[in-house]
């Protein structure tokens, strides 16, 4: 029996054993006689009726599994023939050469390529596996020479010793960096001496006859210049300051109050105050000018600007802890050490503190939680006492002691803190180390490549024949992987491989794909859909 497909392609006659080709073209296979099984082309390796192909994965069944595993088109009655030329067959149009090829219902995505004689995997190239990329990165990051190279070049042991020393050095530097980071979080200060200079000048009043004119006349002296006045200056500097940047005098204080004699200047004009504000401009000193021709007793109250803030303890708690003025964290630490030393923590409920007689007087309770201590401690903390300096403003022109010096202790930032911050922020050495690491990685990779080439040439010089055969086998395996070829080339080069039952099924599918392709081309040319 012969016929023509869509587009006039001649169809080969169906042989009695060509049930697979007939099924591919839509015709039912020859009926099986009594005691006969369906054609091997339609029988699979299992009960599902799938087709077994040597060297490839088996197809899924193309239709309902049954005694004959016959393909049945949806919508067709059992036993009817598939329409041939001129009739709508198969799925909608699509290129048979790509992933969108028209497939028969039930056909898996894997199909026969029209120009190849073996089953193909999907055409899309799989991306490089993540494991291979990760292995490459690890190989690039590895600076250790392989054992085979160390055995070949004994001098490489010196490099391995340097590598071990570098590893220890990196661990030490990393540990020191962590210690520096922890140290920077804490306030690093050191005590320095701040010398305060308090001086005053006196301007006596001028006699009326000293000037040619009087106030209000041309050439006269203003009335304000006739009044005697004095000027007080408060300045200071750090002693033995190694830093190049000098700190302003006002930066050491939170507030400064100058209290003059109330009897001389009255209750409303005897105080001169300066308080730090967020917008305060730092200055090198303070000066106060007032009228007067008498010696004036004054009191300077200097409130230091502690960073972090410090507090003065209640006298009872200060005697108990041995701390007078300190930061809140230091006070809490001293309190905890006292509790631990005197075993005041409850043995069963560890969050409770059993107060002794001193704590009962201070906290006014016999038992309290440890979490309640900060709240109770807030009422026992006060602002630290200011620095009090008593000074006499002298207006006697014969008095040579018009400048007084006072040394006070202040806390300044440790210069080492700035160096540690610069060390952590510096990336110059890190960039240099990274560039050297890249060079080492490239050198190690080059050494490995040279070792591979040496092994290649050494094997070839030792056993040329065996080496060439093994090399060809390796290249053949690589070629199959690169070209995505599935199968056994040794079997495929023999004619008996193509006389197996699967070949007839493959021919039928190839012809069916060609018929579909030609039909779609005719529809596009005629602009109609054949029915």
Curated annotation (Swiss-Prot):
Cellular component terms per the entry's GO annotation: bBAF complex; brahma complex; chromatin; kinetochore; nuclear matrix; nucleoplasm; RSC-type complex; SWI/SNF complex
A Pfam family recorded for this sequence: SWIB
Residues covered by region (Disordered): 20-85, 205-226
InterPro entries reported in the protein's UniProt record: SMARCD2_SWIB_dom (IPR030090), SWIB_domain (IPR019835), SWIB_MDM2_dom_sf (IPR036885), SWIB_MDM2_domain (IPR003121)
Residues bearing PTM Phosphothreonine: 217
Gene3D superfamilies: SWIB/MDM2 domain (1.10.245.10)
Function: Involved in transcriptional activation and repression of select genes by chromatin remodeling (alteration of DNA-nucleosome topology). Component of SWI/SNF chromatin remodeling complexes that carry out key enzymatic activities, changing chromatin structure by altering DNA-histone contacts within a nucleosome in an ATP-dependent manner. Critical regulator of myeloid differentiation, controlling granulocytopoiesis and the expression of genes involved in neutrophil granule formation.
Name of the protein in question: SWI/SNF-related matrix-associated actin-dependent regulator of chromatin subfamily D member 2
